[in-house]
A protein has these predicted regions:
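Terminal low-complexity/charged segments
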Residues: 1-131
Length: 131
């Protein structure tokens, strides 16, 4: 999909109930989900012929200490085929355990370890979660 508007429509139509919101800003698509939908959404955007987000560029956290869901997990994906970036995010409370993406993107290994080390966010099924 060469057009971000078409990409947004595709993601919303295919993943409707798993998507909380989408927007196009700064020539990127921003997608907000619930943590329970991370694996399904990630598999779709990586493997679907119209999305092809086959590179995980980064995983980071934004800390909002005044909010009950203190942490926002942010994943940055790149589609080389379509030259597009997608920012996928969701909020969690302190001490929640979330799914690891290492089985889908092996490069998530180090990035998830860094998030664990810096923010204490634990990843379920991570092969080597240590500081």
């Amino acid at each position: 999909m060469n057009n971000l508007t078409d990409l947004e429509k595709k993601i919303n139509s295919e993943l409707g109930t798993k998507i909380n919101s989408t927007k196009i800003q700064h020539n990127q698509i921003y997608v907000e989900i619930d943590k329970e939908d991370l694996i399904d959404v990630t598999l779709f955007v990586k493997t679907n012929k119209d999305t092809k987000f086959r590179q995980l560029i980064d995983i980071t956290v934004v800390d909002y200490p005044e909010q009950s869901q203190r942490f926002k997990l942010v994943y940055l994906f790149l589609s080389h085929e379509f030259n597009q970036r997608m920012i996928l995010s969701y909020n969690i409370s302190e001490n929640e355990v979330i799914s690891s993406l290492t089985s889908i993107f092996p490069s998530a290994n180090w990035r998830e370890r860094e998030v664990f080390d810096m923010y204490g966010v634990s990843f379920k099924d991570h092969p080597d979660l240590r500081r």
